[in-house]
């Protein structure tokens, strides 16, 4: 959450005020650039719509998770309600042998398109 991120930022900066070695100084620069994705009521509505479509159209279930990483979704979530990670299934992300399961492309794209169509009626 943003509150947790701000708490950690304060704690890290407070460490700089505690000299461990006499005669030394620690300077911390920078700070929070991109915040976490917050689960707002609008985002929950989007999750509900997507989950229902996946269940009704494909007999599947949607599992929500928090990855703790940084994506384009973190950037857009600052301005608009954002769902992330709706693309094809992939394996070994960010490695030399990353791969995707192309069998998931059509159902995932269809679910996204149906969700987008329904959300235009809601928002």
Where does each model-flagged region fall?
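Metal-dependent amide/peptide-bond hydrolase catalytic core
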Residues: 1-123
